Design a protein with these regions (language model features):
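Conserved short-loop catalytic and cofactor-binding motifs
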Residues: 19, 150, 176
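Short glycine-rich loop/turn motifs that provide flexible caps or phosphate-binding loops at active sites
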Residues: 55, 105, 179
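Short phosphate-engaging motifs
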Residues: 61-65, 110, 184
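Glycine/serine-rich phosphate-binding loop and adjoining beta1-alpha1 elements at the start
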Residues: 77-172
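Glycine-rich phosphate/diphosphate-binding loop of Rossmann-like nucleotide-binding domains
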Residues: 169-196
Length: 196
């Protein structure tokens, strides 16, 4: 039994490259289950944020999974980061959960996105006991680390940093237009409403 984590980051792929790895909400579950089956993986966890896409596979045969990934051409390999030891997978996912490699160091939205991705993966039954247990441990340890006194009071996200910057530089009469109803825009709007 082995893990394989394939990670794509905006630094290597750019936003256009990452968008090619995104799935519509309507088809995501089916496409991910098809990917899992086509590659011969036992379990699959998928996380997509604005700066990264992560695929965590659990398999009985790592060599076969790698061969299937290589021949299927379903995932680009030239811009991917690979983690195959359990230790490297855990370290990478913990760094992701703690936003150590994000636009804003320590950004608190990523942990919530990881939890949501976990719940969605449970819902469409792509997880099994191995991957589910691993993600639960990552969430538990990340929450524990985030609750440390020095980290607990840091409320950082791209949205709050941008909104804070706007309130410091803009005037009270400046008009703002939000395009899109995504989580980042909603958070920025709440922050500006509260403090602007």
């Amino acid at each position: 039994m082995s893990y394989l984590l394939i990670s794509y980051h905006i630094q290597e792929m750019g936003s256009e490259g990452l968008s090619k790895l995104s799935y519509s909400e309507e088809s995501r579950d089916r496409q991910l289950l098809d990917l899992k089956e086509n590659l011969g993986a036992k379990e699959l966890f998928h996380l997509a944020t604005c700066n990264r896409v992560e695929y965590l596979f659990h398999t009985d045969n790592l060599e076969e999974l790698l061969e299937n990934i290589n021949t299927s051409k379903q995932l680009p390999l030239d811009t991917a980061r690979f983690f195959s030891s359990k230790e490297s997978v855990v370290q990478h996912l913990l760094e992701v959960a703690l936003s150590m490699d994000s636009m804003i160091f320590g950004e608190n939205q990523i942990l919530g996105q990881l939890k949501t991705a976990y719940q969605e993966s449970l819902k469409f039954k792509s997880l099994g006991p191995q991957t589910s247990g691993l993600i639960q441990e990552i969430l538990k340890h990340a929450k524990k680390i985030r609750s440390e006194p020095k980290l607990r009071n840091i409320h950082t996200s791209v949205a709050t940093v941008a909104a804070r910057e706007f309130t410091e530089r803009g005037s009270k009469t400046d008009k703002i237009l939000f395009i899109g109803a995504g989580e980042t825009n909603q958070l920025a709007a709440r922050y500006l409403h509260k403090y602007g």
